[in-house]
Swiss-Prot record:
InterPro entries: MOase_MmoB_DmpM, mOase_MmoB_DmpM_sf. Its EC number is 1.14.13.244. Belongs to the TmoD/XamoD family. It holds the Pfam family MmoB_DmpM. One of its GO terms (molecular function) is phenol 2-monooxygenase activity. Keywords: Aromatic hydrocarbons catabolism, Monooxygenase, NAD, Oxidoreductase, Plasmid. Disruption phenotype: Cells lacking this gene cannot grow on phenol. It comes from Pseudomonas sp. (strain CF600). One of its GO terms (biological process) is phenol-containing compound catabolic process. This is Phenol 2-monooxygenase, stimulatory component DmpM. The gene is dmpM. Pathway: Aromatic compound metabolism; phenol degradation. Active as a monomer. Formation of dimers inactivates the protein. The multicomponent enzyme phenol hydroxylase is formed by DmpL (P1 component), DmpM (P2 component), DmpN (P3 component), DmpO (P4 component) and DmpP (P5 component). Part of a multicomponent enzyme which catalyzes the degradation of phenol and some of its methylated derivatives. DmpM is a regulatory subunit that stimulates the phenol hydroxylase activity of the complex. The steady-state rate of phenol hydroxylase turnover is dependent on the DmpM concentration, with a maximum observed rate at about 1.5 DmpM per oxygenase monomer. Higher concentrations of DmpM inhibit phenol hydroxylase activity. May act by altering the redox potential of the oxygenase. Required for growth on phenol and for in vitro phenol hydroxylase activity.
Length: 90
């Protein structure tokens, strides 16, 4: 089984701020730009932090907001008000 986790977003203005935050918080992540889609993958774990997204957006942000732009995910999800984590728990 692959140990890569991934998340793919529609390529739009809202998602670009989230992608930027993911890259800031996960320097090991690989970003792939496709037509109308941005896919981010990483070995074993990706963390999306509310605080980083809020800094990029310049406003308050609820983690649930990003789900409107999510196309697909791969990995086990651990989510609370401050973060959204994808990882494989073996």
């Amino acid at each position: 089984m692959s140990s890569l986790v991934y998340i793919a977003f529609q390529d739009n203005d809202n998602a670009r701020y989230v992608v930027e935050a993911i890259i800031q918080d996960n320097p090991h992540a690989v970003v792939q730009h496709h037509p109308a889609m941005i896919r981010i993958e990483a070995e074993k774990r990706l963390e999306i932090r509310r605080e980083t997204v809020e800094e990029n957006l310049g406003r308050a942000w609820d983690v649930q907001e990003m789900l409107v732009d999510v196309i697909t995910i791969g990995g086990n999800v651990d989510e609370d008000d401050d973060r959204f984590v994808l990882e494989w728990k073996n």
